[in-house]
Amino acid sequence: MTKPTLTYFPVRGRVQFPRCLLEYLGEEYNFNEVKTISDDLRKQLLFKQLPLYQEGDFKIVQTPAIIDYISEKHDFRGKTKEERARAHQCLAGIMEVLDHCLGYSFKMDKQQQEKFRNESPIKKFFEGFEMVLSQNKYLASGEKETYVDLMAFVMVDYVTNLGLMPSGDYPKLISLKKHYESSPQLKKYLESRPQSNF
């Protein structure tokens, strides 16, 4: 089997999601770190953006699409069409959280960060995820975890790292974060990943 390659910049960024997924699933992969997008690389990118996932001749961009492809390959998307739909619903919410945080975080001083936490546009997503996890063990509401539980961990990890955790109590999400942080599959990667806010 061809070992896949992920191409991205030397930061956590959006590639953190598929990297954590590959690490957790135990799939070996190559990481191609680039400082800039060269002209040759740009020609391979459908939307001229990274990350890029490549497996032999197959190439795909856009983080949600990469996550979906890897999860499908490992049967990690949910057992029923309802579970898969709920997982996709939550992933869309996670990507919205990421977009909100990355759109604001680099422009904020501490006072603005505090205001963001208290009036946070991401609060409604955290409340929604917390509600689902209060009623079900997993976000897709099935009997087993799916990729979206792991992606929720990456989201909470991101938001915490950026200092943008919304006000309120989210014990289920914090418990989820602790669970994956202590996972043997992820431990080595989490300790060696780029030390960047983004």
Curated annotation (Swiss-Prot):
Residues 80-198 form the GST C-terminal domain. Keywords: Transferase. Residues 2-78 form the GST N-terminal domain. Pfam families: GST_C_3, GST_N. InterPro entries: Glutathione-S-Trfase_C-like, Glutathione-S-Trfase_C_sf, Glutathione_S-Trfase, Glutathione_S-Trfase_N, GST_C, GST_superfamily, Thioredoxin-like_sf. Glutathione binds at residues 8, 42, 49-50, 62-63. Its EC number is 2.5.1.18. GO terms for biological process: glutathione metabolic process. GO terms for molecular function: glutathione transferase activity. PROSITE patterns: GST_CTER (PS50405), GST_NTER (PS50404). It catalyses: RX + glutathione = an S-substituted glutathione + a halide anion + H(+). Belongs to the GST superfamily. Alpha family. Conjugation of reduced glutathione to a wide number of exogenous and endogenous hydrophobic electrophiles. This is Putative glutathione S-transferase alpha-5. It comes from Dictyostelium discoideum. The gene is gsta5.
